[in-house]
Amino acid sequence: GPITTVSQEFPNTQFGIVDDASVAALNVTSMVFSEEQGSYLAGVAAALASKSGKIGYVGGVRIPLLQKFEAGFVAGVKATKKSATVDVKYVTEFPDFSGFNDPAKMKVIVKGMIDKGVDVVYSAAGGSGAGNFQAATEAAAAGTKVWTIGVDSDQYLTASSAEKKNMLTSMTKRVDNAVYDVIANAVAGRTVNDILDAKAGIYGRRYDLTNGGVGVSYSGGYINKYKAQIDAAAAKIKSGAIKVPSVPGK
């Protein structure tokens, strides 16, 4: 790809790439995230907040990156409440990437889940996520309580007042911290070059629960009462006692 070409052209310049660990070059820092770990904690919160035991996950496009979110979330739900079920859907199938920007289709999918008794929905779908929040707002207006879970940033902070009432938490992925990390190190004349894959020659850093790369947000205060359980799960993941799957069904 372009970064491979440009990094070879400018060997004395340090480059950074997010969500990609395929460029084998010492002057390319790959910033990758353990989204499955943050999603596991979101699953713990979802299982504890759900009254029906029916939970939903909607990804934007069925690709390995978003299946990491799915796998972790389902594992977190199941570890917390064995009897709970997770309805998994994707807005589009690969290679149709419109699933990241189709809130109308997301809303239809989530409404279908709500009709079947789902009362917590986690969406990892870029711009399509707005459809999840709209569906929950409309359900609330009709007298049905449905919790939503945001993704990447703390979406409570940018939600409308109506959406905030139903936003349980967000799975936060601190791309901001990772990029700052790389730039701050570059300014100091250092590189962020942990070995990610020795055989393939991939360098960079994995951002996970141990270094605050992923997590869940407490804005709104709705999951404050579950903090002990969430912290306990996080501690087990950090110690390796819980191995969170990054592939569905594993």
Regions found by a protein language model. Name each.
Residues 1-250:
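A residue-level marker of the well-folded mature domains of exported/periplasmic proteins
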